[in-house]
């Protein structure tokens, strides 16, 4: 059973996600990722001179150098944000020259898939690495993470040798909510310190929000550590296993097995289970899993040592007191908010106030730098400018990052009809 829906969204919203080539395209990307409405509010001081006023009116108000644009993000809390980002029933190349006009029903190496992995890097997986911090926002325990090793090769710079392609991992693992988080502020961090950053996929209930992707392309050995078998593709099932109390009891998982298990996420009850767990003969046994069998979908990004490959979406921060530089995954909020070029706020729906237009989660204001000391977090700061770590992430604290990072589906249990499902928080 699936969690009860709220607002409806277009099923194809996330099927085509363009590259960030400019600020405008970046905001369009966010609009495609989720039902966000961006309101632009610009005010300017009037002058007493009629001639000056006439000259002022000759150019758009947005061009004023003295008044930053004020942006209010209005975001729906829709359960469809937890669906897969890449639906595999859309023409990804629609409108491009030479487009054959057919549906791209599987991975397409000529397309760059956005997500927490750099599409042009190769990743290894370490099953024993610590990938969470107990102080992070509601993350679950569990070890294992991906880490970039080197640059990818091939015609499209997406191929690897005995490793995971970042482009392929984005296609496999990303949900719609992950794309929203990635575009806005770099992604959900399960570790956020001055020396390490680990991003993790959204918590996906193992109801019908879970998804499986089956890939049998002859280049599978260039995209994964697994060999090609013409008669046996590889199935990848994505979910977080929910407990009897209706909350996730595991870290975000990707389970991998040899064979075509296209209905692994379409069973009568809970999804992405091993046969050993539920006794369903249609599900694969854990012993037949490939590699680590279960992969925690967390990735250690923005290598601080400088010895390994570093993702292209990492932003450099320098502590002016110590001279130490750190790197953090960043999005549009950091790009336009940290220097005060734009001011941001956020409103979302609320179950506590369902008929009053939702709640103001963050009033429009400076995203960072509200105090005089960049090495400390001041009220209103969402990023510490000296090292890029997030600020003010406590429960009930206003903030765009804090609010969106805390969104989570809870209440679903495979033993109920799903009537108690809903959103975490108010």
Map each language-model feature to its residues.
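N-terminal secretory signal peptides that target proteins for export/translocation
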Residues: 1-24
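Divalent-cation-coordinating short motifs within acidic/hydroxyl- or histidine-rich contexts, strongest
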Residues: 44-426
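Alpha-helical interaction segments
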Residues: 19, 30-31, 158
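Bacterial N-terminal signal peptides
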Residues: 26-40
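A subset of signal/propeptide-processing and intrinsically disordered low-complexity segments
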Residues: 2-5, 38, 52
């Amino acid at each position: 059973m699936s969690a009860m829906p709220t607002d409806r969204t277009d099923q194809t919203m996330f099927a085509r996600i363009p590259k960030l080539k400019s600020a405008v395209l970046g905001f369009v990307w966010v609009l495609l990722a989720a039902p966000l409405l961006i309101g632009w509010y610009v005010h300017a001081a009037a002058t007493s001179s009629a001639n000056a006023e006439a000259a002022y009116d000759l150019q758009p108000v947005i061009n004023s150098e003295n008044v930053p644009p004020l942006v209010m993000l209005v975001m729906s809390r829709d359960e469809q944000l937890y669906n897969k980002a890449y639906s595999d029933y859309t023409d990804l190349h629609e409108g491009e020259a030479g487009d054959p006009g057919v549906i791209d029903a599987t991975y397409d190496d000529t397309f760059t898939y956005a997500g927490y992995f750099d599409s042009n890097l190769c990743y290894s997986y370490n099953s024993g690495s610590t990938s969470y911090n107990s102080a992070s926002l509601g993350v679950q325990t569990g070890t294992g993470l991906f880490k970039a090793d080197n640059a990818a090769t091939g015609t499209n710079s997406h191929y690897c040798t005995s490793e995971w392609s970042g482009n392929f991992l984005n296609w496999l693992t990303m949900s719609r909510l992950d794309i929203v988080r990635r575009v806005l502020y770099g992604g959900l961090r399960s570790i956020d310190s001055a020396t390490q950053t680990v991003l993790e996929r959204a918590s996906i209930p193992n109801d019908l929000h879970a998804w499986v992707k089956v890939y049998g392309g002859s280049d599978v050995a260039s995209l994964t550590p697994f060999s090609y078998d013409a008669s046996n593709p590889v199935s990848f099932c994505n979910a977080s296993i929910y407990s009897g109390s209706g909350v996730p009891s595991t870290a975000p998982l990707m389970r991998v097995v040899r064979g075509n298990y296209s209905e692994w996420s379409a069973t009568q009850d809970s999804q992405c289970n091993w046969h050993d767990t539920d006794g369903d003969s249609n599900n694969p046994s854990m012993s037949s899993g490939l590699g680590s069998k279960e992969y925690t979908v967390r990735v250690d990004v923005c290598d601080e040592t400088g010895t390994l490959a570093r993702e292209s979406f990492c932003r450099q921060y320098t502590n002016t007191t110590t001279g130490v530089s750190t790197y953090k995954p960043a999005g549009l909020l950091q790009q336009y908010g940290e220097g005060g070029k734009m001011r941001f706020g956020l409103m979302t729906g609320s179950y506590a106030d369902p008929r009053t237009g939702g709640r103001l989660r963050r009033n429009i204001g400076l995203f960072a730098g509200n105090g005089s000391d960049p090495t400390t977090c001041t009220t209103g700061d969402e990023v510490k400018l000296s090292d890029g770590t997030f600020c003010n992430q406590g429960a009930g604290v206003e903030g765009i990052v804090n609010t969106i990072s805390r969104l989570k589906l809870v209440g679903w249990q495979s033993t109920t009809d799903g009537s108690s499902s809903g959103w975490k928080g108010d």
